[in-house]
Amino acid sequence: MALKKVLTIAGSDTSAGAGMQADLKTFQELDTYGMVALTAIVTMDKDTWSHDVTPLPMDVFEKQLETALSIGPDAIKTGMLGTEEIIKRAGEVYEASNAQYFVVDPVMVCKGEDEVLNPGNTEAMIKYLLPKATVVTPNLFEAGQLSGLGKLNSIEDMKKAATIIFDKGAQHVIIKGGKALDQDKSYDLYYDGQTFYQLTTDMFQQSYNHGAGCTFAAATTAYLANGKSPKEAVISAKAFVASAIKNGWKMNDFVGPVDHGAYNRIEHIDVEVTEV
């Protein structure tokens, strides 16, 4: 049986823990054929690990899209898009394709950075991406920005944010709580427009988790492409990334990536699913 084809529209992380590198590794681990349309190149200062984001010229981006669409992706994922123009174009690309699924990872900051890359991007995501999204996968900060609620401190806050984001057009919302809500458990919240589900795993080490968000969204995309329902896809993605985080490793004094192959090579992590 031919592999399902999945396209990521994302930036390149030169350290290869996040970005399109994380996406392609995850797609391969989950038996899909990964393709990429690159939006930007992210490099790091060797002494401070501060990030430098270099956008690619729009004509180069368009040529990549032309190639990818000629192949015909079954599912499309977005990551770091960088500019309002590219955000708008990503939504148009999904509509122009025959892809069944559109997963939006609303990347707003680089790991370790505190400021939104481009504040205008948030409104562009709300306008051009959320109404088309099969699943949107914000972390707590991103969910606070997309919903307009700001800082989210509890499951109840996450439920309010998920409802607002759903009402903006996303078909399914999964908010990643991670380590922010509890030191012993990792909580995510999934909402399908009718029911809220809390997805829980044990909390594993958090020192080496670079690329966790990209990996989660990429896994969701691959699972959707291979036939899982959105609910099944996000639960499976939670298990996949939990294994990756648990087995994360130290790259240098500044960062350590998740192990994208841990789910298949080392262990599966159980996910507790409860209505809340």
UniProtKB/Swiss-Prot annotation:
GO terms for molecular function: ATP binding; hydroxymethylpyrimidine kinase activity; metal ion binding; phosphomethylpyrimidine kinase activity; pyridoxal kinase activity. ATP binds at N139, K176, G177, G178, K179, A180, D188, G213, K238. It is an enzyme of class 2 (transferase). GO terms for cellular component: cytosol. It catalyses: pyridoxal + ATP = pyridoxal 5'-phosphate + ADP + H(+). Its EC number is 2.7.1.35. Mg(2+) binds at E142. SUPFAM superfamilies: Ribokinase-like (SSF53613). Keywords: ATP-binding, Kinase, Magnesium, Metal-binding, Nucleotide-binding, Transferase. The keyword Membrane does not apply. NCBIfam families: HMP-P_kinase. Belongs to the ThiD family. This is Putative pyridoxine kinase. It comes from Staphylococcus aureus (strain COL).
